[in-house]
UniProtKB/Swiss-Prot annotation:
It is an enzyme of class 3 (hydrolase). This is Palmitoleoyl-protein carboxylesterase NOTUM. Keywords: Glycoprotein, Hydrolase, Secreted, Serine esterase, Signal, Wnt signaling pathway. Residues 1-19 form the signal peptide. It is found in: Secreted. It comes from Schmidtea mediterranea. Its EC number is 3.1.1.98.
Length: 527
């Protein structure tokens, strides 16, 4: 916009110097130049990707007559932003995350400290959202050209509540809100042409996807009277049924193990749990269906899992916040927890799991560029998309007997983005789980004093937080400075200085090495 103003001013100045005015000779041909510049740079221009229409999500609240409510009784709604490609028939529906509450105390605390997750009273009429909801191709290579829907979270029930009436003075309408959004979208003329819907969610929103995706597909089919290809992307919602490091009295949401919190929460929420999972788990164990490793095996629609092996929320619930530090025993527990997460994720058809300490990855501006084994997340999703294209073809073959289900007419759109890959894709390309393989690290040549060399290592070592060099750095709890892998070990009383001394190197030399070199040296060097 600034460049346009400068150009405009310069052109006008030059014309005035030469005796021309905007109303004379200039007004014929030269005015066309200014008109085009204005159109390209006008933030309200319908053809500009920078226009407000394509940059901001617009709020649509449900009418007062609707029978869905946020916790406090206010009317919920959702935000939409059209694709910059007017022809796009692909939609991304994002479910917001934000923990939950499970009794009167935790719900009251939520009302006081996170009111926007409790009520729609102060929701803005428009929002600019980033991460996987950005329309910037650099930030969001995979979904920047999708029509996008953002559903704010105000039910505190992991998107599961179905009871119409209040419970303890509060509404828990999570699954009912999703039904209402889907029903409202199917009245949208643009949405009626939809070919593909990606249900995406982070944290509590990811659990919402796992619990509702199959049911919402059935609802869409019924409303549109045809099949639509549905798939899911679940971020930071693979919570584990794993013994906590220490016991807790469960008075605070961040301190309560999943089983205790979910058992209590279900009494408030009256949740809608997928029938297949509920039946498989049996009476009294339905709470397990909120756990990623349990519900995933019952899903009918392809769902891609994105997870930090050392998920920050999981560490809190397991009583081992990473920056709290502690003993070697505690660090060993953290490693075992990460290893268990990796083991359970192997069942996922599509997965990207890095050994970082992170949570809600898709909402960050750098989400696409986190890597595992030198393959970035957005590249992994490209391979997954190629796999999905194969699944779409299977669906088309099944409905060919009824041409009305697939006939869409000639499309005026010739330049729609196509999948980057096609044909048979090696499954390992969209199943990436970090393992800190030493064999991938020892390619570094490290010069040690006294002719010391790297010994032959085992194929893998126990998982280590931050062993992935693309992890976002942690901030030291005291200094606030970015922490290296070495700093993290020192936080757990590992005497790095003694190890360095035994290897004949200084701490300064050790700190100058990158993460992979440090791991290789500390875990593989002969002493």
């Amino acid at each position: 916009m600034k460049s346009y103003l400068i150009l405009n001013t310069l052109l006008l100045s030059l014309l005035k110097i030469n005796g021309f005015s905007k109303s004379s000779w200039f007004s014929s041909k030269t005015s066309l130049i200014f008109d085009r510049i204005n159109k390209l740079n006008d933030p309200q221009s319908s053809n500009s990707i920078h226009s407000r229409k394509y940059q901001y999500f617009q709020l649509k609240k449900f009418p007062n007559s609707t029978n869905v409510r946020c916790n406090d009784g206010s009317i919920p709604g959702y935000y939409t932003r059209p694709s910059t490609t007017n022809c796009s028939k692909k939609w991304l529906i994002f479910l917001e995350g934000g923990w939950y509450c499970f009794n009167n105390n935790t719900c009251e605390s939520r009302r006081r400290t996170h009111y926007d997750l409790f009520s729609s009273e102060f929701w803005s009429s428009e929002r600019q959202l980033g991460g996987i909801l950005s329309n910037n191709e650099r930030i969001n290579p995979n979904f920047h050209d999708y029509n996008s829907v953002y559903i704010p979270y105000c039910s505190s029930d992991l998107w599961s509540g179905k009871q119409l009436e209040k419970t303890n003075g509060l509404y828990f309408h999570g699954s009912r809100i999703l039904d209402t959004v889907v029903d409202d979208l199917t009245q949208n003329q643009h949405f009626k042409k939809v070919h593909e819907v990606a249900f995406v969610g982070s944290s509590a929103g990811g659990i919402g996807v796992l619990l509702n995706i199959d049911r919402l597909k059935r609802r869409l089919k019924k409303k549109l009277k045809r099949k639509v290809f549905i798939h899911g992307i679940v971020d930071s919602a693979w919570f584990l049924d794993y013994p906590a490091y220490r016991q807790s009295n469960c008075t605070h949401i961040y301190e309560c193990p999943p089983e205790n919190a979910l058992r209590n929460g279900m009494k408030l929420w009256n949740p809608r749990i997928p029938r297949r999972c509920k039946k498989f788990q049996g009476r009294g164990r339905e709470w397990k269906c909120f756990m990623g490793p349990v519900i995933y095996r019952h899903l009918k629609n392809p769902t891609f899992i994105i997870q930090s092996l050392f998920d920050d929320a999981q560490l809190q619930m397991s009583k081992v916040p990473i920056l709290e530090g502690g003993s070697n025993k505690k660090f060993s527990y953290i490693q075992q927890l990460g290893g268990f997460a990796a083991q359970t994720l192997r069942q996922a058809k599509g997965v990207f799991a890095h050994s970082c300490v992170d949570h809600e990855i898709l909402t960050k501006s750098n989400w696409a560029y986190v890597s595992v084994n030198n393959q970035r997340l957005h590249e992994t999703l490209n391979y997954w998309q190629a796999y999905l294209e194969g699944e779409k073809k299977k669906i088309k073959k099944k409905v060919q007997k009824n041409p009305k289900l697939i006939k869409t007419g000639k499309s005026p759109c010739k330049n729609l983005r196509k999948p980057k890959f096609s044909g048979n894709i090696d499954q390992s390309k969209y199943q990436l789980i970090d393992s800190c393989h030493i064999s991938q690290i020892t390619s570094y040549k490290i010069q040690l004093p006294h002719n010391r060399t790297l010994s032959r290592c085992a194929n893998a070592i126990p998982l280590i937080p931050l062993c992935n060099p693309t992890c976002s750095p942690l901030s030291h709890p005291i200094s606030g400075l970015s922490m290296s892998f070495i700093d993290l070990l020192e936080l757990y009383n590992v005497r790095i200085n003694l190890i360095a001394k035994s290897l004949g190197i200084s701490m300064e030399q050790l700190r100058k090495m990158n993460t992979q070199q440090q791991i290789s040296l500390l875990y593989c060097s002969s002493r």
